[in-house]
């Protein structure tokens, strides 16, 4: 069944929150507050939660808080944010008790809308769409969310500052860097490698960096690749983004394919803390900052 397939998708290790849908859809038209009070927002989507925090708004409730902390890293969720359970199966009774003013979802969570709309107005915000420019889509989504919480001015500042700061970071990077191969481990022999339509590539483009992965990608901008496929990539710098599954780091230290990859032998692998690879503008800033700092430290020979 379609619904079962959707649940399996969300219950996978990443629980991808994005959708290739190109249009935002709502079950209720946004109503402006007479006193412009910030509405109490619940969401099952981490990118929406991240965007709210970037705008200075703490969400009332978020799905799968513990996994958010592992995969998203920053911005940190305040301790008073209520965990409403799995993003694919939020605790509806708890949500009803919280009485949110609005519930925000991505199109992937559309099967939840009929039941969630009995609790509060539900609005779906499209975040990822391979048919449109990702950077523009994320800007539009940020402004849409900002309008709902009366933070349009803050959103405009956030977006302007991001574009300015990325340009400044670009100027600080070492010259003549090799292409980068950005991955997240699935197990000791398979990774997600990020290419076209990914947040990571969108940031790299704005930093003037080349992506070594030119293979096909899915709607969220990654391919699942085996380490053997990297044997055919002659020159690239490996960048590994946390989290790494339990036990994988230890197995990679053992003699095996990883240790014999030319990409691993020719230069130290760059490791970055967790960044939500399907995130919004704040994830874009975090990735840009972490990557540029890692490249600068490496150029100085400082790998501590």
Segments the model singles out, each with a brief description of its role:
Residues 40-94, 98:
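A short, structured surface patch at a secondary-structure boundary
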Residues 18-31:
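Cleaved targeting-peptide boundary
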Residues 1-7:
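N-terminal export leaders
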